[in-house]
């Protein structure tokens, strides 16, 4: 009972603070985005999204990230991250300020949390090639056009691992003569292929992440078990994190690949990477760590969590309550004066170079031509 109360309190805490985040997002969307879309994106990522991560972390148990391999260091360069998808909480250990995550379209309709992810410009897909192709192209063109250093996370497996999905994955792989796996699901290529085609102009680096949790033994849950495990109880879920239960550390292995290496034959590339994941996870089961080569780095990172971030969030909202009305009360009178001026100017001077009177005059001219045309027909 106490655990349920604690979980409910944590969820309420996250929702309340997320609602405040929504307000801050709305303020930026209203005041900054119309003036400078690129600045809006950078503020939303480096300030608001990073703050949301910090605030949410106050509810979850502390965890260290033991990162082996090639750790991304150039934060100004676009990156595409591919990863295995063990459970519904693994994205939490990847999420940072400028990261965009590819998610199911239905999630954007979740109240408060979904609204926030939508304003953070996560990439929502319907799993419809016709819709997703055009949507991804427009989405990536917009990020590239603003020179935004996005880190886009995609889980090519498309869903979390369960025994029923493993059986379907293996049957599908056998039909296509592709490798069959036990620890991971066969990766899908269509969504990632569209994304790679859309970012061909910038050729981002590709980072392959493999995640594993302490005491992981390879247990795969059934649909009935959901995200819980009977043996690998240290594998977290969002439910367990809300209850304050989570692993003390998470193992992440990162390996960097060039854009050209991935695009030459994406299916073969993903099959090779997932075969490596299978072997890497088997090694982890035996040794409780990932293998490290001599030229690879080992870094221990701590997830940010500070009650001061909550103070910053609420202070920012309080200031916004005072500043937003002032800005709006200043904006609308000035806008009204400008519209009246443009109207008067357009009436007495038809040679103006101002854009608003020009459009107004153009509208009057076309209306006059239409009226004259109708009169001549009569």
PLM-predicted stretches and their roles:
Residues 1-22, 299-356:
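Alpha-helical bilayer-embedded segments of polytopic membrane proteins, i.e.
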Residues 1-79, 93:
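Membrane-anchoring hydrophobic helices of lipid-metabolizing enzymes
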Residues 26, 70, 106, 157, ...:
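Generic structural motif
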Residues 32-37, 129, 177, 331-332:
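Short, solvent-exposed helix-helix connector turns and helix-capping sites enriched
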Residues 42, 46, 130, 182, ...:
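Charge-dense, low-complexity intrinsically disordered segments
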Residues 59-232:
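Soluble catalytic domains of membrane acyltransferases
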Residues 148, 173-313, 345, 349, ...:
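Catalytic lobes of large eukaryotic enzymes
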